A protein has these predicted regions:
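Residues within the helices of the helix-turn-helix
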Residues: 18, 29, 59
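Short, basic-rich loop-to-helix N-cap that marks the start of a DNA-contacting helix
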Residues: 49-63
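Conserved hydrophobic/aromatic packing and binding residues within compact polymer-binding modules
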Residues: 17, 31-32, 43-46, 72
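A short, Lys/Arg-rich alpha-helix, primarily the initiator
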Residues: 1-26
Length: 92
């Protein structure tokens, strides 16, 4: 099997996290408390697109927001190669 390539769009993922927080009525403080963080800096970095949550935190975030990790991540033009065929997928 050939490798698959993708690019996570960090800033757009941050905007998606912020949008989902607003839609679900959560604040940064709510996420901070749910994650058990002493301060909200990590959450602010996520929504500003300066960093991404760890996999563990993505799982917690997806449960908090009642959605999947795939619905939180914004990915740009996957190139998927299977059995010698190439497919170009646009996921947003």
């Amino acid at each position: 099997m050939e490798p698959m390539y993708l690019q996570v769009l960090q800033k757009e993922t941050g905007r998606q996290i912020k949008k989902l927080l607003v839609e679900n009525g959560y604040t940064v403080k709510d996420v901070q408390n749910a994650m058990g963080f002493e301060n909200p800096q990590a959450v602010y970095k996520w929504i500003s697109g300066r960093s991404l949550p760890s996999l563990d935190n993505f799982v917690i975030l997806s449960r908090l927001l009642h959605t999947s990790i795939e619905d939180i991540l914004v990915i740009d033009e996957d190139i998927v190669r299977l059995w010698g065929f190439s497919f170009k997928l646009i996921v947003q």
